[in-house]
A protein has these predicted regions:
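Hydrophobic anchor at the beta1->P-loop junction of P-loop NTPases
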Residues: 18
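P-loop (Walker A) phosphate-binding loop of NTP-binding proteins
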Residues: 21
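Hydrophobic positions on the alpha1 helix immediately C-terminal to the Walker A/P-loop
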Residues: 29
Length: 238
């Protein structure tokens, strides 16, 4: 059973922006931290992945910017939460939360996210979430573009092989057949696309706290992020 986000109003919301490259642990760490503080977790990358998947399902070449842009008004994309509080993505009413995690969709997401009109199309939606909720929002341009006035900005990173290993293990757990070499190759290509795109390239905000998660356990990384949030907001995790 799905439930729509319940909006709050009339109070100043707290926003935590977490950016970083693919495989740095953004989603897992952000989700865990949000749960501990009772905040809404927003995985913006899932939205771009959903657009990439929509293009694939419609037979649209994501390198054809005009075709992708023309498709946007036709899409019905919903970010909702299930009874366990997990973020789920619906595309035209269908749950695509698993489909958007496939490696090929990751590359499509990187390409559609490089289209300026796509990013502009999604900016208001993402900012609205932060205006109406206490959020931990992760992505690649949250601290630099989406939430430039976030209460706290964190830039997560790790070595390419560490990130590829995490992504590889994550895919195996989800039953996706792949190889470590393939995941590493895709990750390096994704890094290149994300850092070199003209529209909102991946980079740390000038006032972001840099956090290298190389060699860290999940618990260590979550603990460090929670410490930073507590120091900045005065709120203690539950």
């Amino acid at each position: 059973m799905w439930q729509q986000i319940q909006y709050k109003a009339g109070e100043k919301m707290i926003s935590i922006a977490i950016d970083g490259p693919s495989g740095a642990g953004k989603s897992t760490i952000s989700r865990a931290a949000a749960k501990l503080f009772g905040f809404i977790y927003v995985d913006t990358g899932a939205i771009y992945r959903t657009i990439g998947l929509a293009a694939k399902l419609r037979g649209i070449d994501v390198s054809d910017n005009d075709a992708v842009i023309s498709m946007l008004p036709e899409l019905r994309i919903e970010l909702i939460y299930n009874e366990s509080g997990e973020q789920c993505m619906l595309l035209d009413g269908a749950d695509v939360s698993r489909d958007i995690r496939l490696p090929e969709v990751s590359m499509l997401a990187s390409k559609v996210s490089a289209i300026p009109e796509v990013r502009v199309y999604l900016v208001d939606m993402q900012r609205k979430m932060a205006q109406l909720h206490n959020v931990v929002m992760d992505g690649r341009d949250i601290g630099t573009v989406i939430l430039p006035n976030a209460d706290l900005k964190i830039f997560l990173t790790a070595g390419a092989e560490d990130r590829a290993r995490r992504r590889y293990e994550e895919l195996l757990q989800k039953g996706v057949e792949t190889t470590f070499e393939s995941v590493l190759d895709d990750l390096i290509k994704r890094d290149e696309q994300d850092t070199q795109r003209a529209a909102a390239p991946l980079k740390a905000a000038d006032d972001a706290v840099l956090l290298d998660t190389s060699g860290n356990t999940l618990e260590q990384s979550v603990s460090e992020v929670c410490r930073l949030i507590s120091e900045r907001t005065g709120i203690k995790p539950e």
